[in-house]
Amino acid sequence: MSSGNQTFLIGKVSATHGVRGQLRITSFSGDMDSFMALRSVMIKKPGGGMETLAVAEAKAHGKKIILSLKGYTDINDVLHLVGREIYVLRDQLPLLSDGEYYWCDLLGLQVMTEDGDILGELVDIISTGSNDVYVVHGGGDKEILIPALDDVVLDVDTVAGRMTVSLPEGLLDL
């Protein structure tokens, strides 16, 4: 079980939005709703360290999030935040149902076949709309794209740090 004090990267400030100090956020969480319940965010400073800022409002805007911070009401107040990463404490994230995971819990898992063959490390997740696709780096330059489907992903064990998959026939030949 993860500690409530653990920080997780959930997005990045991609731009300002309007002139009233709002920020356009690219979400890395895979779940837009996780932003809606946030009370505060931590924004990474250029030299390291974190700055905790109170959230006034977060709302979906297409595939982005529009984030308003308390005390920031003008575009000039937030220009310096563009390009920075956004983190949250684990205890601020909504609880998920069984079989659901935050991307930050999946990244870094060792991916193996049901026969025990190690495919590599899950290094990225691509959101395609219909289903996510897991990017797994094997040895060398080998990259495997695995669809995140119930009949492909057999087991996820975040405590043990592994994911077991049943690859569609011919996937490794691509």
UniProtKB/Swiss-Prot annotation:
GO terms classed as biological process: ribosomal small subunit biogenesis; rRNA processing
MF GO annotations: ribosome binding
Compartments it resides in: Cytoplasm
Limits of the PRC barrel domain: 97-171
Keywords from the UniProt entry: Chaperone, Cytoplasm, Ribosome biogenesis, rRNA processing
Cellular component per GO, a single term: ribosome
Function: An accessory protein needed during the final step in the assembly of 30S ribosomal subunit, possibly for assembly of the head region. Essential for efficient processing of 16S rRNA. May be needed both before and after RbfA during the maturation of 16S rRNA. It has affinity for free ribosomal 30S subunits but not for 70S ribosomes.
Record remark on domains: The PRC barrel domain binds ribosomal protein uS19.
Subunit description: Binds ribosomal protein uS19.
PANTHER family reported in the protein's UniProt record: RIBOSOME MATURATION FACTOR RIMM (PTHR33692:SF1)
Protein name, entry field: Ribosome maturation factor RimM
Source organism per UniProt: Geotalea daltonii (strain DSM 22248 / JCM 15807 / FRC-32) (Geobacter daltonii)
Lineage: Bacteria, Pseudomonadati, Thermodesulfobacteriota, Desulfuromonadia, Geobacterales
Gene: rimM
